[in-house]
Amino acid sequence: MNKITFMGVELEEQGPSDLIVKALGKSIKLMDLETFIDTTGFEKDPIMNDYFWQIMVTKQRTHLSAMLLQCLGYEGEFRVQQQHFKRFLKSNNIHPLELTSSDPDIKNYPTIQDEMKLLKPNVISNRKWLIVEPREFKKVIMKLNTKHGDRIREYYLCLEELLRLYLEYCVYFKEREAKLQITTLEQKLEQMNITMIEMKEEMNLSMEEHADKLDTLVDQNEELKLDVSEANEKLETVTHKLGIAVEDRSPRLEQKPLRERFVLFKRNVKNARFQYYAIRGQSIYVNGRLTLYNERYPNLEIIIDIFCQPNPRNLFLRFKNYVKDDERFNFAGNNVECDITYESIMKEIFEKLNEEKRNV
């Protein structure tokens, strides 16, 4: 089985233990050791915690007070305790520091100051207090042969297991944090892609709306022209004199790109309200618009394509006027809303209106 190893801690491939899972579920932030102890239910020993835990985690020297010597298993009067302990230190080649009442370092040890309050001046002047380095005190614990020695060493073994468990928790926490950062980054990238797509769609829609507004303005202009034309027709009564051919009434331009043209195409876009769109103008303009819309709507289908239409804008306006009361058709600029079942009817109407150009 493959294992992940970090600082001597092996993480099983199947994942963290139930205890680690519990700790990970406690907080999204990395817990300190004290909170981890409370969360995992590690059994605390008040005496052990007060003396031995602090010695293990701090770098401060330790004052071997009467209370501490009792915890180590030394009994009797303090003088006797201290003598026995000094012999123990000497036999194990451990050299403590001895402070007197005149030593300025005494102020760094509250337990010494507390003892001095209970002693007579003559006793204080002759008293010596034993101080040991943290590393030396740990040696004391490992070699201690009093009745409390095994209990103290057992506590240290438990602390070692606790620290290993906490280290394992930290590794899994960092692993989870890294995965969350990757997931968050992926989500941000996905959101950026979605935003870019939405912006592109909005831009396309905006361009189409502007084109529709332009076409609407052109339609309004054409309607004004129609009004003027109708007024002129009332003044002119020469229609009966026109005996010319249709081609003479609407002669073709020699340049094909400049000939007028009318196109109605179907977008073939799913769920689109307006499937049909009209383009009116010179052939060169119509071709340019068709190229643009073919890129936008790959399934575009031309329904009506009339070349040499003398007035394509007029044709579309007459179609709108023809079906204005017909609920089967709706308009928005050059857009036409029509159910596909009525497509053939719409084509027939356009063809009928186009043929009216031949009526004198």
From Swiss-Prot:
Entry's transmembrane regions: none
InterPro entries, per database record: DUF3627, MSV199_dom
Protein name: Putative MSV199 domain-containing protein 212L
Signal sequence annotation: none
Keywords carried by this UniProt record: Coiled coil
Species in which this protein is naturally found: Invertebrate iridescent virus 6 (IIV-6)
Annotated coiled-coil segments of the chain: 173-243
Pfam families: DUF3627 (PF12299), MSV199 (PF10553)
